[in-house]
Regions:
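Cytochrome P450
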Residues: 1-414
């Protein structure tokens, strides 16, 4: 491979390993690499061995760029949005002839991001979410009870259903509305015309408008946001911005990431009967186990950034306006290792990770994700204590349009 543009990039060794085809070729992006699909731990381990910066110039042009693989470099980039900017993201929906921006993901300045954060962070705080913990557990228990007598299931379907129902419930909408769940799923998959997203927006607008006029509406974290938008002429967010935030929550950020984490947690537990028993006997360890799943199997293994100026990392020059991939999973595995971490007495111990990002773009829904994971895993283990992979079944990953890495299927039996 010719490295004349950046001559000090490391050689790609072992030859062809990261590509997975045995060829003497540069590595592919993790979304395209069969090596990642076969063994993601080995993929990131070998990527780190190539150096702190690894150039990807094969495969899909939209996925090419530079991987940052070291923990400290990833963390520094997350905390420096002026140099490593979040690329603009839009929905397929057109507004006044232009695509609707995905805010606050696409906001590039701290002051603008703070305008959103001041309104949104209190809605998704542990204190605001705490009243929903019991209902989230009840919802998980109901789903587990429904399938327990079947002696088998595709856990991906169960996790997707739970994540969807949980989000609708926490937001004050009917959790059992199958049509709403289908619309949310269609919006996640998306289409070039934006029709699926538009139908979801219309349904959300109708549902929230009806709720605002209903004094007996169920509780939900979005009601204060919508009430202030309607009644406060000095409210810091516009109606379009609030609509974009809500669409982002229901079509991109709020369902698939949690569903992915749940399925990978169940995959680990299906392979480890001792760990299942340990968590069942001591549920207080479940939050630490969930954090380890976020560290080892983050729904977004790497996130994109664009350099606003030339930078040098690990002796490698990265030009301005280059695509850079912050390898969150590689960063989390750097010091924590590739296995669930144990303490001196065998207890599950959480290690630091960056699955939720960092800095001003840190995931708004991280506390909700943790609450849902704890509720689901607790109730699942209470009702389905012993389970395993269905004989002959091999799990495979799939990369969703939202950039979430999910399992295609997870066939369990008990």
């Amino acid at each position: 491979m010719n490295h004349t543009d950046v001559p000090d990039l490391p050689d790609y060794a072992p030859r062809g390993a990261l590509r997975g085809d045995g060829a003497s070729s540069p590595p592919l992006h993790h979304k395209e690499s069969p090596f990642f699909a076969a063994d993601r731990a080995a993929f990131w381990r070998q990527l780190r061995e190539l150096g702190p910066v690894v150039k990807i110039d094969a495969g899909d042009p939209l996925l090419r760029g530079y991987y940052l693989t070291r923990r400290d470099d990833v963390r520094a980039a997350l905390l420096d949005p002026h140099t490593f900017a979040s690329p603009p993201k839009t929905f397929a929906i057109q507004l006044f002839g232009a695509p609707l921006p995905q805010v606050p993901l696409s906001i590039g300045t701290r002051s603008e991001h703070a305008r959103f954060g001041k309104v949104l962070h209190p809605l998704f705080s542990p204190r605001a979410l705490a009243p929903f913990a019991g209902d989230l557990r009840a919802r998980a228990a109901k789903l587990a009870d429904k399938i327990s007598d079947r002696r088998q299931c595709d856990a991906v379907d169960v996790a997707d259903t739970y994540a969807s129902q949980a989000l609708f419930m926490v937001c004050g909408l009917p959790p059992d509305d199958a049509r709403a769940a289908q619309m949310a799923s269609a919006a996640v998959i998306g289409d070039t015309t934006g029709q699926a997203q538009l139908e979801l927006v219309k349904w959300l607008n109708t549902s929230f408008d009806a709720g605002l006029s209903d004094p007996e509406r169920p509780p939900g974290i979005l009601w204060p946001l919508l009430e202030q938008l309607a009644g406060d002429k000095d409210f810091p967010l516009t109606q379009v911005e609030v609509a974009s935030v809500i669409l982002l929550l229901f079509s991109v950020a709020g369902i698939e990431m949690v569903a992915s984490a749940i399925t990978f947690a169940l995959l680990h537990l299906a392979r480890d009967p001792q760990l299942r028993a340990q968590l069942r006997e001591d549920p207080a360890q479940i939050p630490a186990f969930a954090e380890e799943i976020f560290r080892l199997e983050p729904p977004g293994p790497a996130i994109p950034r664009v350099t606003t100026r030339k930078v040098e990392i690990g002796g490698v020059a990265i030009p301005a306006f280059s695509s850079v991939w912050l390898a969150l999973e590689a960063a989390g595995r750097t010091n924590g290792g590739d296995e669930i971490t144990r303490g001196s007495h065998g207890e599950v111990r959480r290690q630091r990770h960056w699955a939720f990002g960092g800095g001003m773009h840190r995931c708004l829904g991280m506390h909700l994700a943790r609450l849902e994971m704890d509720a689901f895993l607790t109730e699942w283990l209470n009702r389905i204590p012993n389970f395993e992979l269905k004989p002959g079944f091999t799990p495979t990953v799939v990369h969703k349009p939202t950039s979430v890495t999910h399992l295609r299927r997870l066939k369990l039996r008990w």
